[in-house]
């Protein structure tokens, strides 16, 4: 085991930390040495799960051998994919400094959007999203159907399914399908490690049931960090409940308590209001973080957490994006009420190095607008300040809390809230279970069944154009009646814009098929249109050779049924700049109200 510990030491030393020899690391390594095909790994936030799994693959690279063709690290969101990509790059650099190897390694990321070179999960190490992994694996990508290439990538790879709890939705849809996806990944030769801080017993049971017929070495008992043996090196967190609206007390909370401070709200609109309140009251060094800020700006703000020099008076106002991927020692946390597993993750942001205090607003109305009412009601019944504080470091306590909430009865009630979900779930399950039998049948035969392979909602890619370019596009549309307009701009400039100025707009299940989104609508000659940027291979004329040309697409409506079959739709919708907000001196507040009302 010393060889693995050497890798871990190199990684943590590079990050300015000292080595902690957690027992559960060796439990994981032993399970891999025993050639387990499926492993569940449960440990608290900040307990080194990533280093434990990286040590396995990086040790092989340093030694110049391969047990797996590659490593796929799978995460729920694009921002986490970028963060993990950078983290793995740093870990690899640390190994090169200490061991002089490996010399040549390809590390890539693939989040399903428009990337100049389509990697299809290529690379020695690839970070990717769950959606991208699965739609690539099953042969449904918006730009191609390279089915055998993606299946070949899965065979013999180490597949890390990280932050699984974030896939949970209001109808328990993704957790119901994921067990069958895991079964297929194992069936095609993958070694799967499921990593999470909170593992509901009912999900574990469903995964084990889905893989019971596979001839594979499945480790049925999760590898769990034992708090009596392994002590997480972090401060204690004192939890306090209060009955007021967090917006009403935000200013007083940050002024009266130690910093750095983190405030988490359940919606973008409320987070933006809090940010403005704190700025207006001159509360100090305030930053805003949520999912509807363009990618380049958001990445710059997230770099705060990677810098060695910490901003002691920092106040972060955020949404659910702060539940994972933030390694910062916040002394004070204030959050709105949310489901128990979400609360445990939020509390894990506090007291990473020293003791901290966490305040939880118990106003249920700010939670039930976002989360299933039955889950919030059950969470409130189980909440206890002392037990919640212990859940951050004690997996047994966090498991007890989670399992008290997510019972079969609660999940049944969650599904009842979404009309027609059982039929959709049945169709998707049938496709996943019968995938092997239908491997060489055209993917177009399964578009309806595969439209919701992981989520019921829809992700709309959007882009904010600079003012001059936006006016240029509007003029182009006003001068031409066509719904497909060649855009005379260098394709590399468009690709750069997509990388820096994009964001994703989430439309949850239950939205009507034809919707209106003022935030991405534009008035052209008195009519409303949606505008998309499409990049495709075209010929300028019959006599000319082909080239890649950007095109503006005009649409009078958005049909969610059509988009849901786009399987990773890559053509971004242009944002109406009137709906993208800024604070003083051009500070990005983001696409706060895409629906033209409370969002």
Would you name each region that the model predicts?
Residues 96-139:
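Inter-Walker segment of RecA-like/P-loop motor cores
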Residues 107-117, 268-269, 286-300, 319-323:
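Conserved helicase motor
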Residues 36-56:
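Walker A/P-loop
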Residues 2-40:
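Conserved pre-motif I regulatory segment
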Residues 68-91, 199-203, 268:
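Conserved Walker A/P-loop ATP-binding site and its immediately adjacent core
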């Amino acid at each position: 085991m010393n060889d693995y510990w050497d890798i871990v030491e190199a990684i943590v030393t590079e990050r300015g930390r000292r080595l902690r020899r957690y027992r559960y690391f060796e439990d994981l390594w032993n399970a891999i040495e025993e050639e387990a095909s499926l492993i569940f790994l449960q440990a608290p936030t900040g307990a080194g799960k990533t280093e434990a799994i990286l040590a396995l693959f990086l040790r092989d690279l340093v030694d110049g051998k391969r047990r797996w063709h590659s490593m796929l690290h799978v995460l729920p969101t694009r921002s986490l994919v970028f963060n993990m990509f950078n983290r793995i790059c740093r870990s690899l650099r640390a190994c090169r400094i200490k061991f002089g190897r490996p010399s040549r390694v390809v590390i890539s990321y693939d989040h399903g959007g428009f990337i100049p070179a389509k990697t299809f999960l290529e690379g020695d190490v690839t970070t990717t999203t769950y959606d991208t992994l699965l739609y690539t694996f099953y042969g449904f990508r918006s730009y191609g159907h390279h089915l055998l290439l993606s299946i070949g990538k899965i065979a013999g790879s180490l597949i890390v399914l990280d932050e699984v709890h974030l896939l949970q939705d209001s109808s328990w849809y993704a957790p119901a399908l994921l067990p069958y996806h895991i079964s297929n990944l194992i069936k095609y030769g993958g070694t799967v490690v499921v990593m999470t801080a909170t593992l509901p017993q009912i999900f574990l049971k469903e995964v084990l049931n889905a893989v019971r017929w596979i001839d594979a070495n499945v480790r049925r008992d999760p590898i769990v960090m034992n708090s009596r043996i392994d002590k997480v090196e972090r401060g204690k967190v004192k939890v306090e409940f209060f009955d007021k609206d967090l917006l009403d007390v935000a200013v007083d909370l940050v002024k009266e308590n130690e910093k750095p401070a983190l405030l988490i709200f359940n919606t973008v609109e409320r987070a933006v209001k809090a940010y403005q309140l704190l700025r207006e009251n001159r509360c100090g060094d305030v930053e805003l973080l949520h999912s509807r800020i363009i990618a380049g700006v958001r990445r710059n703000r997230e770099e705060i957490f990677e810098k060695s020099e910490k901003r002691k008076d920092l106040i972060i106002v955020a949404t659910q994006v702060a539940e994972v991927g933030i390694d910062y020692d916040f002394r004070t946390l204030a959050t709105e009420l949310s489901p128990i597993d979400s609360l445990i993750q939020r509390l894990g942001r506090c007291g990473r190095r020293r003791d901290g205090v966490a305040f939880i607003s118990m106003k249920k109305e700010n939670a039930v607008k976002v989360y299933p009412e039955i889950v919030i009601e059950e969470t409130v019944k189980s909440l206890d300040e002392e037990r919640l504080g212990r859940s951050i470091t004690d997996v047994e306590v966090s498991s007890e809390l989670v399992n008290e909430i997510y019972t079969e009865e609660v999940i049944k009630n969650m599904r009842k809230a979404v009309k027609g979900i059982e039929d959709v779930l049945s169709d998707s399950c049938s496709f996943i279970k019968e995938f092997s039998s239908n491997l060489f049948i055209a993917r177009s035969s399964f578009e309806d069944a595969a439209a919701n392979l992981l989520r019921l909602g829809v992700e709309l890619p959007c882009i904010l154009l600079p003012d001059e370019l936006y006016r240029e596009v509007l003029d182009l549309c006003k001068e031409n009646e066509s719904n497909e307009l060649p855009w005379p701009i260098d394709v590399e400039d468009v690709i750069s814009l997509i990388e820096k100025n994009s964001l994703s707009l989430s439309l949850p299940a239950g939205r009507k098929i034809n919707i209106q989104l003022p935030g991405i609508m534009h008035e052209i000659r008195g009519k409303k249109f949606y505008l998309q940027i499409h990049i495709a291979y075209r010929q300028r004329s019959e006599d000319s050779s082909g080239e890649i040309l950007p095109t503006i697409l005009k649409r009078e409506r958005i049909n969610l049924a059509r988009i849901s079959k786009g399987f990773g739709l890559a053509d971004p919708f242009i944002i109406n700049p009137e709906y993208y907000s800024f604070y003083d001196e051009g500070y990005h507040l983001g696409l706060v109200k895409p629906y033209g009302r409370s969002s």
